[in-house]
Amino acid sequence: MTVYHFVGIKGTGMSSLAQILHDMKHTVQGSDYEKRFFTQTALEKRSISILPFDKSNVKEGQVIIAGNAFPDTHEEIVAAKELNIPVHRYHHFLGDLMNQYTSVAVTGAHGKTSTTGLLAHVMQGAHPTSYLIGDGTGHGVENSKYFVFEACEYRRHFLSYNPDYAIMTNIDFDHPDYFTDINDVFSAFQEMALQVKKGIIACGDDEELQKIQAKVPVIFYGFGEDNDFQARNIQKRTDGTIFDVFVRNTYYDTFKITGYGNHSVLNALAVIALCHYENVDVEAVKHQLTTFEGVKRRFNEKPMGEQVIIDDYAHHPTEINATIEAARQKHPEREIVVVFQPHTFSRTEKFLDEFAESLSKADQVYLCDIFGSARENKGELTIEDLQKRIDGAELITDTTTDVLKKHKNGVLIFMGAGDIQKFEAAYVKEVQVAEK
């Protein structure tokens, strides 16, 4: 019996892939650092064993899958090579796995995870679908027709894939520690486009995506009239969003989604376009869109007394704009308060003015210290450089969260890609202690 051993199983993509193989009735185990990580819960539910790193974990007959974060000098990778066991890097293994199915890559600077989750949910309503989402969620079905997965542009990892279809949500400059400028980002997406085998579903409202060249049909979606799939007559309500879809200027159908903000309409439109192309029953699509509950760390909301707390992964100015817009649609009468932790010094420095502009759309802003990456030098930048660009912004630590209590009817959005959740947890604990 083949054992799949994951080196770095707690990584979001690795955890998802491990879940998929387990669901397909394979034997799966993995190793990682002992610090608890949010992806562990799904692994533990499946009784997938998580071991501390040790070269003795590697044994003959295993299939070794290594996370991209671990160098060839890692003790388990060295042990595998000493035993002449091939080591498969995560993205290469995933690229080979998807060839067994009709595969759909979801990529873009923003909206990948939400769109992947939505597409997987909708497709499941019509056909057996396996999926891998970048929030650490994976699900495998033995008789799958489709394989839906999130494909990341960072370090051009998505060039390991040759999917049947690709959804491209947008092209934007991010990851300044790797990409030099928007042209560098575009070149990565252009190269990816040439690897797609059947069709590309691209947001036609995005100026960069309009320039994409491909060997397969490119179907454009968006709000603009030149798009193949266009959303019109949009009704933004506090219980979701309703809109009409026109296909090449002909009315197709009316859809309701549970999401908020223009970005949620675009994500749904991409899914509708792909399903139309694959002849998925429109009634199934409509039903599934109304039952989608979202993905981890994307506008996850919970009430706490008179306040509402939202946990969100937004860590780029474009994403911050979208999250604040969504919060205002759902809670038009409430004060919008953002607690933001910038992620990486390189990104914060590159987009300092853009961060200030997007955060200023909230009614009140609290800033946490910058969450640095292990790969980077702190440099001269401090959180005060961002604070002085935002009127009324205050600094906050995980020991001073009690200041948030004064926003009695507020929507508190804890926002960031680092460890912002510890600030949220500290505040929740603060409130619970005060109530006793």
From Swiss-Prot:
Keywords, ordered alphabetically: ATP-binding, Cell cycle, Cell division, Cell shape, Cell wall biogenesis/degradation, Cytoplasm, Ligase, Nucleotide-binding, Peptidoglycan synthesis
Pathway: Cell wall biogenesis; peptidoglycan biosynthesis
Recorded catalytic activity of this chain's protein: UDP-N-acetyl-alpha-D-muramate + L-alanine + ATP = UDP-N-acetyl-alpha-D-muramoyl-L-alanine + ADP + phosphate + H(+)
Cellular component annotations (GO), alphabetically ordered: cytoplasm
Subcellular location as annotated: Cytoplasm
Pfam families attached to this UniProt entry: Mur_ligase (PF01225), Mur_ligase_C (PF02875), Mur_ligase_M (PF08245)
EC code: 6.3.2.8
Binding site for ATP: G108, A109, H110, G111, K112, T113, S114
Family to which the UniProt record says this protein belongs: Belongs to the MurCDEF family.
Keyword Membrane carried by entry: no
NCBIfam families: murC
Protein name (Swiss-Prot/TrEMBL): UDP-N-acetylmuramate--L-alanine ligase
GO biological process, alphabetically ordered: cell division; cell wall organization; peptidoglycan biosynthetic process; regulation of cell shape
